[in-house]
Every structure is written in C-alpha cells, then in structure tokens.
Amino acid sequence: MPITPRHLRQWKQQGRPIVALTAWDFAIASILDEAGIDLVLVGDSLAMVALGHPTTLPLSLEDMIHHVQAVQRGCRNALIVSDLPFLSYQTSPEDAILAAGQLLKVTEAQAVKLEGGYPRLLETVQRLVEVGIPVMGHVGLTPQSVRQLGYRQQGQTPEAQQQILDQALALEAAGAFAIVLEHIPDRLAAMITAKLSIPTIGIGAGPNCDGQILVTADLLGLTPSQPPFAPAYLNLRQAIGSAVQRYAREVRDRQFLQSQPAEQEPLS
C-alpha cells in the first residue's frame, strides 16, 4: 500500500517508529522499497555521494528531477520526498511554488523538503501548503547553509536551542507535515518531538525522535569518511574495491573465465 504523509502522522500517534533512508537512483530505491522502508528521501546529498561535489550547493532543479524520476521507478510503496535544491525556493514564495510545482508535475514525488525556519521561509511553507504541495521541514544542521553555519552540531547554547524549538513549532503552524531534526542534542530533539503533533525524523538527533533517517551511502559504508552520527552497517566501499581488484587481477593474469566450460567450438 502506498504510504502518504497522513500515515506518518498516524504512526506518531500510535508510537510506531518511522524508517527513512535516502536514494539517488533506481537500483538503491528498489532495494529500499523491497526492504519495507517507509520514506525515501531524494536528498540533495546526492550532489556529494552520487555526483562528487564537495557540498550540496551546486545541485540544480533539473538534477533533482532527473534523480527523482529514477528513484520513482524503483518505489511502489515508500513515500517519496524530494529536497528542493539551493536557491530554488529561498528567493520568493512564488519561485518556490514554481520549482516545487514543476518537480511534482513531472515526477511521482509526493512532497518536498525545505531547510530552515526563518520568517520568509515560513511564508513560503504556508503558500506551498495552500496550493496543495505537502512540505517537510528541516531544522538544526542545514547543509544548504554550510558556508554560514558549517557542519558542526547545532543547538549548543540555551539561546540556540530555543531558536530551533521555535522554528520547529513555527513550521508546524505553517503546515509542514513532518520535520527533519539534524545533528542537534538528544535532549533538544526529545523536547521538540514531545511538543509537536507532527512527526520528527532524526539524523544525528538521538533515539527519541518519531523516526530516523540516514544517508544510504553512509549506512552502507560507501563514503570515504563517516559522519560521527551515522553508523555504517557494511563496509561496501571496501567490498566493492576488493571485488574490482580481484576481477582486474584475473583479467591481467589471463585467469578470467578460465574455469568456465567452453561454450563455442573452435573455428576451423
């Protein structure tokens, strides 16, 4: 059964944890969907893990559309949420509506995710919801603000914690159906989760959120360096490297396929 934003709210009320991961292509998306993942985020992190950029900032709306279309072909049941890339929504609510509308028209994403909780963004969230576009919020560490805030944990002072709490409450009031809490203290995430009626999805925010999300490349150990809050369940980078090296060695030593029976008669 296809999952919708309404299911996430029901699960929060029932105390059922929400399981989310990121995807950037058909192969990963189909594996996640078959494994029963609830929410697949086509995150702008794909700029780094799939396209090799040092940050998420270079990603374009056209890039996002391309990858969402690949992901949707692999998902039958998971809720697909797409990030809106940097500067596709920050300039004005009208630009945000056009960007989100274009993305949802040509893909099967059911919602978009926006970073931050400043007043102008709250107006944008409200306007998007008014025209029928579901919005997921994102507070704490916001990668699109990396040049201003860096990648360090957010909410380390009482004032910063209050600001993040206020942003989360304001995003709920503006109509967001869920909020990602990234790299903030566990206690702050638990407090926000208790105060909101919409689900919180944590990444580096402790165990007390309504759900959890990781970048799948981190989960699988594909990235050269691991974020401090992201456990690797495999070392797939090493496994792939070993397989490729073995293949290369067999080809160079003329051992590749030598153990296979001949399938063709020699030419006369």
Curated annotation (Swiss-Prot):
Binds 1 Mg(2+) ion per subunit. This is 3-methyl-2-oxobutanoate hydroxymethyltransferase. It is found in: Cytoplasm. The keyword Metal-binding applies. Mg(2+) binds at D44, D83, E115. CDD domains: KPHMT-like (cd06557). Pathway: Cofactor biosynthesis; (R)-pantothenate biosynthesis; (R)-pantoate from 3-methyl-2-oxobutanoate: step 1/2. GO terms for molecular function: 3-methyl-2-oxobutanoate hydroxymethyltransferase activity; magnesium ion binding. SUPFAM superfamilies: Phosphoenolpyruvate/pyruvate domain (SSF51621). The active site is at E182 (proton acceptor).
